[in-house]
């Protein structure tokens, strides 16, 4: 059930972030991603409160990413980790290039 909930949201050419809106790390990750202009349908924010029981979702995240916490961020079907991983990529000024390379950003 958790696998289906996650996997049906992960597609190539899309950024998917699983969050709890009450989580400060999730809000910080959203702030970073919201600096970019995504193509329609290329960015999805998933509130994990939609899934019950939530602990099963955390178990599945740990199984596929090595981490149980949110945010869990995926570029396509590949997990890039959580907030600290996203922040590190952003601090290296590489995030825009990565997002461009997977085809999720709008072009003028």
Swiss-Prot record:
GO MF annotations, alphabetized? glutathione disulfide oxidoreductase activity
In terms of one coarse class, where is the protein primarily found? virion
Which residue numbers delimit the Glutaredoxin domain?
A: 3-106
Subcellular localization, as worded in the UniProt entry:
Virion
Stretches of the chain forming a coiled coil according to its record: none
Superkingdom field: Viruses
> Where is it found, in Gene Ontology cellular component terms?
virion component
* Induction trigger: Expressed in the intermediate phase of the viral replicative cycle.
S-S bridge residues: 23-26
Q: Which Pfam families match?
A: Glutaredoxin (PF00462)
Protein's UniProt keywords contain Electron transport? yes
Q: Which UniProt keywords apply?
A: Disulfide bond, Electron transport, Redox-active center, Transport, Virion
The UniProt entry's sequence similarity note says: Belongs to the glutaredoxin family.
What does the function comment of this entry state?
A: Displays thioltransferase and dehydroascorbate reductase activities.
Matching NCBIfam families: GRX_euk
What protein is this chain from? Glutaredoxin-1
Q: Which organism is it from?
A: Variola virus (isolate Human/India/Ind3/1967) (VARV)
Tell me what gene encodes this.
OPG075
């Amino acid at each position: 059930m958790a696998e289906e909930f996650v996997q049906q949201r992960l597609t190539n050419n899309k950024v998917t972030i699983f969050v709890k809106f009450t989580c400060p790390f999730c809000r910080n990750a959203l702030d970073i991603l919201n600096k970019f202009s995504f193509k329609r349908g290329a960015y999805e924010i998933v509130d994990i409160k939609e899934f019950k029981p939530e602990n099963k979702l955390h178990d599945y995240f740990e199984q596929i990413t090595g981490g149980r916490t949110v945010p869990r961020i995926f570029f396509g079907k590949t997990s890039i980790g959580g907030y600290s991983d996203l922040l590190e990529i952003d601090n290296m000024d590489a995030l825009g290039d990565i997002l461009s390379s997977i085809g999720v950003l709008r072009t003028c």
